[in-house]
Structures are given as structure tokens and as C-alpha cells.
Amino acid sequence: MLIDVKNLFKIYHEGEESEVRALDGVSLSVDRGEFVAIIGQSGSGKSTLMNILGCLDIPTYGDYHLDGVDVTELSDRQLAHIRNKQIGFIFQGFNLIPALNAWENVELPLIYQGVPASKRWERVEAALERVGLAGRADHKPTEMSGGQQQRVAIARAIATQPPIIMADEPTGALDSRTGKHVLEILHGLHEEGSTIILITHDNGIAATAQRVIRIADGHILYDGDREGAFA
């Protein structure tokens, strides 16, 4: 089991007496090599859940083990190490650094990892080729379309060779044709052995996953195969 979450809560306080339970007793597990879609409307708790699964945030209480490690007990430095080694992130807003070109954006997490220059070259080149952008390596984000920027973000996510890819609404800012291409890349990565966790509000996109988790008001309403998710 790669991810194991039990009785997870994330509570925000508004004033002295009011509280919002973004996550309210969530439990789930993800095996290595699964393709899981977490679906829900805005405010459902799906992005909060991804932030905790991705070690970008910590729960108010509850248990979370990632590859056997209790991440709720880790320091900020240790969480950053896990993010850099274990997880590749893809966001709806791309989150590329405007001053850097495509090559430099993809290379940056490898520099943080301390990967030698020769290895960095190999990995960046392979990642950009994987997403079909080797010919745009010297282009900055403002010189690329939204779809190209998202493919650079995918290249950045896979360059570190993480076992887990977490994608938060990766097609949300794209047209349908470009979004389909991005999904094809994610499915290709899954076929090569990556564990994919996809956050979406779109039933059609969620239906391409092996497994669907439907969340609303901080609760899991459905967790099972895609055939039963939309019955």
C-alpha cells in the first residue's frame, strides 16, 4: 500500500465558535500503480485532500502514511524532502517561473535534489521529449500556449522520476483538444508504472481513471470502480 489515510480531519476556525470541516473523517488507501480520480465540486474538500496527500499541508488530526512513513510526524524539512523525491505535481495554473525557459523550469527541481549536471541534462531532455516539447526548450512561458505550458509542467513533474503524480485540475485551463492530449500523457505515464492521483470536477475526465473517489462536504460519498461511479 502506497498511501494509507485513516480518519483524516482538516478544520478551519472562523471566529471563536464557528468552524469549517474541509475534511471530516476521510479514510482511503491507494496502491502503487493505481490511477485514481478524486471528483467533487468547488468547496467539496478535494483540493484540501490533495494538499495533504501531497504533503503541502498537514491535517488537523488523523493518520497518514506514505510508503510506510507517518508523515504527520515529520518536520517541514522532512516533508519538503518527501515532496521533492516522491511526488510530482501538476497544477491547473501551471506554476511555471516566468523568468525561466522551459528547460530551466524542468531542471529546477533536479537542482534542488542535487542531481549532477550530466544527469540533469539527460533527464530534462528525456522529459521534454516525452511531452513533445524538445523543440521549445528555450521558450519562456509567455512564449508558449496554455497547452504547451501544461506540458512543460508535466515534464517538470516527471523529471525527478517520482513514483506518484498528483494532478489538480490539469485540464481546467485548456481547450478540450489540448486537455485530451494532457490526459493521454498522464495515461501513458500510468502505463509505465506511475501512480496517478487526479483531482477534477469533470465527470468525463474522472471516468477515464481506473478508480473514482467522489467527495462532498469533506466526506467520501463513493470509492470504487468507474463503472459504478456514474450509475
Describe these PLM feature segments.
Residues 219-231:
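Conserved beta-strand-loop-alpha-helix hinge in the C-terminal portion
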